[in-house]
Regions:
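N-terminal basic/disordered segments at the start of proteins
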Residues: 1-22, 26-27
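Compact, glycine-rich, soluble single-domain proteins
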Residues: 37-56
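Short Gly/Pro-enriched loop/turn and capping motifs at secondary-structure junctions
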Residues: 45, 67-70
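Conserved functional loop/turn residues at catalytic and ligand-binding sites
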Residues: 58, 66, 79
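C-terminal structural segments of small proteins and small subunits
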Residues: 69-103
Length: 103
C-alpha cells in the first residue's frame, strides 16, 4: 500500500514555517521505495487552500518546521500526522524518515 508524505520547502530546505512555504514536495512511497514525487508551487495559496492541497493529494504525513495550532488541529482531524519543528535539508530529512519506515 502506498503512502504520501509532504514536506513544505524553502529552496532545498524544510521551510521554517508551513504557512509561508513557497513550495510543497509530495513523495509517494510504496513498500519503503519512492514510486512518485512532485513539487507544487503554493506561494499564491492562502492557509485553507494549503491545507486542502494536502487532503486532495491524499497526504498521510507532513514533515515541517514551524506550524500553528490551527493547522495542527485541522490536519489531525483529517487523519494526517505531523512531524514538526524539524529543520534541515529536505532530502536528508526525508531519507532519515524513510529509513525509519523500513525498520
Amino acid at each position: 500500500m502506498d503512502m504520501k508524505i509532504a514536506i513544505p520547502l524553502f529552496g532545498s530546505r524544510i521551510s521554517p514555517r508551513f504557512d509561508f512555504s513557497p513550495e510543497l514536495w509530495i513523495i509517494t512511497v510504496e513498500n519503503g521505495d519512492v514510486i512518485h514525487q512532485k513539487k507544487l508551487s503554493i506561494a499564491h495559496l492562502n492557509l485553507l487552500q494549503r491545507l486542502e492541497q494536502l487532503t486532495s493529494n491524499e497526504v498521510k504525513h507532513v514533515i515541517c518546521g514551524g506550524i500553528d495550532g490551527f493547522c495542527l488541529s485541522q490536519l489531525g482531524s483529517k487523519g494526517i500526522s505531523v512531524l514538526h519543528n524539524i529543520a534541515g535539508e529536505a532530502e536528508v530529512i526525508f531519507n532519515l524518515f524513510l529509513k525509519d519506515l523500513k525498520l
